[in-house]
Amino acid sequence: MRSKHLVTLFIITFLSFSTVKVWGKDVFAGFVTKKLKTLLDCNFALYYNFKGNGPDAGSFLDFVDEPEQFYWFVEHFLSVKFRVPKHLKDKNIHNFTPCLNRSWVSEFLKEYEEPFVNPVMKFLDKEQRLFFTYNFGDVEPQGKYTYFPVKEFHKYCILPPLIKTNIKDGESGEFLKYQLNKEEYKVFLSSVGSQMTAIKNLYSTVEDEQRKQLLKVIIENESTNDISVQCPTYNIKLHYTKECANSNNILKCIDEFLRKTCEKKTESKHPSADLCEHLQFLFESLKNPYLDNFKKFMTNSDFTLIKPQSVWNVPIFDIYKPKNYLDSVQNLDTECFKKLNSKNLIFLSFHDDIPNNPYYNVELQEIVKLSTYTYSIFDKLYNFFFVFKKSGAPISPVSVKELSHNITDFSFKEDNSEIQCQNVRKSLDLEVDVETMKGIAAEKLCKIIEKFILTKDDASKPEKSDIHRGFRILCILISTHVEAYNIVRQLLNMESMISLTRYTSLYIHKFFKSVTLLKGNFLYKNNKAIRYSRACSKASLHVPSVLYRRNIYIPETFLSLYLGLSNLVSSNPSSPFFEYAIIEFLVTYYNKGSEKFVLYFISIISVLYINEYYYEQLSCFYPKEFELIKSRMIHPNIVDRILKGIDNLMKSTRYDKMRTMYLDFESSDIFSREKVFTALYNFDSFIKTNEQLKKKNLEEISEIPVQLETSNDGIGYRKQDVLYETDKPQTMDEASYEETVDEDAHHVNEKQHSAHFLDAIAEKDILEEKTKDQDLEIELYKYMGPLKEQSKSTSAASTSDEISGSEGPSTESTSTGNQGEDKTTDNTYKEMEELEEAEGTSNLKKGLEFYKSSLKLDQLDKEKPKKKKSKRKKKRDSSSDRILLEESKTFTSENEL
C-alpha cells in the first residue's frame, strides 16, 4: 500500500516538475509539439537553402530587433502550405516528406487561440539561432539589411567613376569601359573643364601602358561615339528598425548612423563603415569648404548630409519576395531585405535642410495578430469559432424577474426643462449645404488618419486591434453628425428632398473603401492609411443602420433623430426599459463574437449624443427653428439618464464581459460627454474655415455597389429606393483633370461641378435614359404629392399619412401654410407632369445645382384628407414596453401577496 502511495507521489512530482520546466521559461514550448517542431525545421531548411547552393549564412532574419523580417518569414513560409520548389526537389537537402501540405501557423493556432506576438517572435528567434549554429558553427548571425543606394555628393561621384562608351572592342566585341581607381579619380577631380578634358588630363598621368592605350582609343573616338562618366552605386546598409527606432525621420536616421560609424571607423565592423573612408578621400581631394563642412557635420547634429534628390513616392521601400532572390537579372544580395524605391533618390549635400515631408518619416512595422496570416478561409473560420468557444458562455436574455428587481422607477421619462444656454458653446452653422458637409467630413477624416498614422506612440493601440483607440469613435461620430445635419435641414425645409436617399455615411463608406481615390489627400498607398480607411469605411456603414432602422428603407425615420433607433431596439427613449432594450440588442451581436457589437455600440451612443447636441444648439441659437422640430429630438436630460443607465448596466456583473470586450478594441471616451462634444466642436470649426468651404466638389466614387455582410445589418439597397441622376458620372481621368484646375476658377464654377451621387446599382442594371428618368419622377411623387392617375394619388396619400404619423412621443403637427404655397405646389405638379412628356431628359441635375420642385415637408399634410387624431399615436412606439410593464407589475404584486 505504501509503495502505491510512493509511486503516485513520484508521478505527481514528475508531472509537476515537467510542467514547470515546460512553461517556466518558454510560454509556447508546451504547444510546439514534435510535429510542429519538425514542420518548423522544414521551413528553416527550405528557407536557408532556397537558392540551391547550400545553406546561406546571409539569409539570417532578425525576428526580435526587426519585426518586419519576422512577419515576412511568417507570410512567405510559415503561413502557407509547405511545398518544395522544383529546383530543390532533386537535391538531398532535408527530409521534407512529413511537412508537405502543412501550414505551421494554422496548426499552431489550433493549439493556442491567439497568442501575444512578442513571445512568439522570441521563441522562433531562439529556434532559428539553434538551426543557424548547427549549420554554420561559430559564425555570428547578422540580420538582413535595408539598402539605401546613393551615388553622388553634389555632382561628384562618391566612388571612383566608370567611363562607359559605345566603342566596340575588336577582339571581344564588347563595349569599351574604363574603371578609375582612387589615384586616377584624384587626378580626375583636380582637372578643370569638361569631362573629356579631365579624361585627357588623366591620360597624361597614367603609367600603365595597357590602361593608357584604352584611354587613347576612347579619346580618339570622342567625336564619333557616345562617351559618358557614370557614378557607381554605393548601398548604405542599415538594420532599419534597430538603427532608426530613436529617430523620427529616415534621412536624419542615416545622418546619425554616419556620425556614429565615422567616429569609430577604425574599430567598426559594419559593412557600411568604408563609406567614411570614401567620403574622407573625396573631401580631401576637393579640399575646402567640403572638408570643414564634414567636420561640422560630425560634431553638430543640426548639420545634415543626406538629402532627397527627388520627390518621394509610395511605397517608400521595395520589399522582395523569395522568388526575387532567384532572379539572375536582379542579382540581389542575400543579405538585402528591402531597398529604397528606385524612384526615391537620395544624394549627399551640405546645402539646405531636410524638407518637411511625412514621406521621410520612419515607417516601422506594427505588431499584427498572427491569425492575420492564416492560410485559408477555412483556417480563419476555424480560428474564429475556436476563439469564440473559449471565450465563455454567451449572455442569456434578460427576464421579467430581473427587470422587476433592477428597475426601481417604472415611470416614463419626461423632461421639458429649458436648456441653460450660458453653458452651451455656439458651434452649429445651418447655412452649409449637405453636399458640402459630406466632402468636408471626408477631408476631416483624412486629416485624422494622417495624425494617427504619423504618430509613433503605440500606447493607445488596443491589444486585439491594429487601429488606435478612439479612431472608430471619431469616424462614427462625424458620420452621425453630418447624417443628423441632413435630417435637421430636411425638417426645416432647407435642403433639396433628393438628399434624403443620399446617405452621408454611404458616401464616406465608399470614399474610404475606394482607397485608390485617396491620392492627394494623405499618404496614398500607405499600408497603415489603407487599414485605417477600411476601418472607417466599415464603421460608418452602421450609422444609417441605427438612424434609419437597419436595412429597411422607411421614409418616416427621416423625420426624427431617434425614431430609427427606437425601431431598431423596439423601444422608446421615454420608456423605463429603453436602456435594457439597447443592451439586449447589443447582446445578440456580442454572443456572435463579432466586431459589429463594437460598431453598433458606438453608433447607438453617438446617435444619443447627437440628439443632445442638436437639441442644445437649436434651443439656444436657433429658437424659431427649434420650436418647429423640438419634438423630433430627445431632451438632453433624458439623454444623460439613458447614457448613465447604459454605462451602469455595462459595469454590472451580468454585462461586464461586454464592457471588457469593448475595451479590448476601443476607448472608454465614448462615455465622456466632454470629449465627445469637443470632437463635435472641432469638426464644426473645421467646417467654418474658408479653405474648406471652397471645396464643394465631392470625390468621384466608383460604381461598385456596397456589399453587406448579412441581410439584416447595415443599409440594404432596393432599386426603388435609389434616386438616379441624369448626368453620367465622370471618368477617373476627368476627375483627376479637375483636380489640377485653378482654385479660383474652381470656386467660380463650383455649381457647375457639383457633387456626383454614388450610384448604388451596377451600370449593367441601369435602364435606358428615358425609362430611368421616368422611374425617378414617379418615385419622387411618393414624397411630393399625388400623380394624375388616381392610383398614384392614393399611394402618395397613404405615404403622407405614414410620414405624418411617425413623430414619436409628444409630437404635434408643425405644418403651416397659406394659399400662395398651395398654388406653388399645384404649379410644381404641372411642371413635373411636363417633365414626363419631355424627350427622356430630366431637369434633375447633380447635387444642389438645380431642382424643379421645392415642395416642403409641411405641405404634405395639405394633400391628405383630414383625419381625427388618434389618442394612441403618442405612445405608438412603446406598446411592447407597456406590455412588459404590466407583466412586471403583475409579478411584483404576486410577490407581495
Curated annotation (Swiss-Prot):
Biased composition (Low complexity): 802-817
Compartment(s) where it occurs, according to its Swiss-Prot or TrEMBL record: Host cell membrane; Parasitophorous vacuole membrane; Cytoplasm; Cytoplasmic vesicle, Secretory vesicle, Rhoptry
Pfam family, one: RhopH3_C
Bilayer topology annotation: Single-pass membrane protein; Peripheral membrane protein
Basic residues composition-biased segments: 865-876
PTM: Proteolytically cleaved near C-terminus.
Role according to the record: Participates in the formation of new permeability pathways in Plasmodium-infected erythrocytes enabling the uptake of nutrients from the blood plasma. Required for maintaining invasion capacity of merozoites. Required for the trophozoite to schizont developmental transition of the intracellular parasite.
Protein name, UniProt field: High molecular weight rhoptry protein 3
Annotated source species: Plasmodium falciparum (isolate 3D7)
